[in-house]
């Protein structure tokens, strides 16, 4: 069994490389997802993903679509590395003499991976959401100011233009949260993140493993890279849509600023109840299409890098098929 021991540094490097490539490719869609999910029954700014991206480019420029990307690019390496390496570790610990895992054990390994990753995922998402949603809130304030000016033209008192709110930075947000709420401020929404990421991993990893196994050659060699990519895309999109209701609740809970006439929430159940009462069941699927488009290539790329064993090649280590 010693010759099958997992090389943790290689898994961490593979996860980091995959995360950096994936985030760079799909981050604008993730921004659209966050803004669509945060829209309530107040001032609705966007009607679809494409409408959101077009309006973002017009009002904030091309790089506005990458607002918050620096946080993701910084923390996605440990986040994806922990997720993939933890799943590999738990699968290794649960296996017996190289025998194929049962579905229950595959789900158990995925559960462990999802639980481990929230250490990094929660503060990363907390900061990213504030930066991504700042543009939507600024656009709302601009529209409200314009409407106030138009209504003020017929009144005796002149309207006052709303002052521009400075855009927050990740460093400023981190400092303010630590000062006002301590480390718990960065982990707001931890429970909701667990309720999203643990079921996601329970669905994703067993589904990927079985889909990838279908493409394995009869000779017993590892699956071709394109099979790993397609398996990652299918498993990722399926798991993403399945847990999208929890992602909507998590996004709402982690948003510190609210738009015009938007609800505030005291916890997961309160948020879910208000969404259901005020917006209907369909609100839990807001951003599901965007999330599937984000997760599919993100995990497809991750599994290609992971299963090709790029880090093992760089480090001169033998490639071990998990």
From Swiss-Prot:
Compartments, as annotated in UniProt = Mitochondrion inner membrane
One annotated GO molecular function is: L-aspartate transmembrane transporter activity
Transmembrane feature ranges: 12-32, 62-82, 107-127, 189-209, 223-243, 292-312
Q: Where are the Solcar repeats?
A: 6-93, 101-214, 223-312
> Has the keyword Lipid metabolism been applied to this entry?
no
Cellular compartments per GO CC: mitochondrial inner membrane
Q: Which InterPro entries match?
A: Mit_carrier, Mito_Solute_Carrier, Mitochondrial_sb/sol_carrier, Mt_carrier_dom_sf
Alphabetized Pfam families for the sequence? Mito_carr
Q: Which reaction does it catalyse?
A: L-glutamate(in) + H(+)(in) = L-glutamate(out) + H(+)(out)
In terms of PROSITE patterns, this protein maps to: SOLCAR (PS50920)
GO biological process terms on file: aspartate transmembrane transport; L-glutamate transmembrane transport; malate-aspartate shuttle; regulation of insulin secretion
Arranged from A to Z, the UniProt key words for this protein are: Membrane, Mitochondrion, Mitochondrion inner membrane, Repeat, Symport, Transmembrane, Transmembrane helix, Transport
Q: Quick one: signal sequence residues?
A: none
Similarity-based family: Belongs to the mitochondrial carrier (TC 2.A.29) family.
Q: Give the protein's function.
A: Mitochondrial glutamate/H(+) symporter. Responsible for the transport of glutamate from the cytosol into the mitochondrial matrix with the concomitant import of a proton. Plays a role in the control of glucose-stimulated insulin secretion.
What is the protein name for this chain?
Answer: Mitochondrial glutamate carrier 1
Per the UniProt entry, what species is this protein from, by scientific name? Bos taurus
């Amino acid at each position: 069994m010693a010759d099958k021991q997992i090389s943790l540094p290689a898994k961490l490097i593979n996860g980091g490389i995959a995360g950096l490539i994936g985030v760079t490719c799909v981050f604008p869609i993730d921004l659209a997802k966050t803004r669509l999910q945060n829209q309530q029954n107040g001032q609705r700014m966007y009607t679809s993903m494409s409408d959101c991206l077009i309006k973002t480019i017009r009002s904030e420029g091309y790089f506005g679509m990458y607002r918050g990307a620096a946080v993701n690019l910084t923390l996605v390496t440990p986040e994806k590395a922990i997720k993939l390496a933890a799943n590999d570790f738990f699968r290794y610990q649960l296996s017996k003499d190289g025998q194929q895992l049962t579905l229950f054990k595959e789900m158990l390994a995925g559960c462990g991976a999802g639980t481990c990753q929230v250490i990094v995922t929660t503060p990363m998402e907390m900061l990213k959401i504030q930066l991504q949603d700042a543009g939507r809130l600024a656009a709302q304030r601009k529209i409200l100011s314009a409407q106030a000016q138009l209504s003020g033209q017929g009144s005796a008192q002149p309207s006052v233009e709303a002052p521009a709110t400075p855009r927050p930075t990740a460093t400023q947000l981190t400092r303010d949260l630590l000062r006002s709420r301590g480390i718990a401020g960065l982990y707001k929404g931890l429970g909701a993140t667990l309720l999203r990421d643990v079921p996601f991993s329970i669905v994703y990893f067993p589904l990927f493993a079985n889909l990838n196994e279908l493409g394995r050659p009869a000779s017993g060699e590892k699956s071709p890279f394109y099979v790993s990519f397609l398996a990652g895309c299918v498993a990722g999109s399926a798991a993403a849509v399945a847990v999208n209701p929890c992602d909507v609740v998590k996004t709402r809970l982690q948003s510190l600023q609210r738009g015009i006439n938007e609800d505030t929430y005291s916890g997961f159940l309160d948020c879910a109840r208000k969404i259901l009462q005020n917006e209907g069941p369909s609100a839990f699927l807001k951003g599901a299409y965007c999330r599937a488009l984000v997760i599919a290539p993100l995990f497809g790329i991750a599994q290609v890098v992971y299963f090709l064993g790029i880090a093992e090649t760089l480090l001169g280590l033998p490639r071990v098929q998990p």
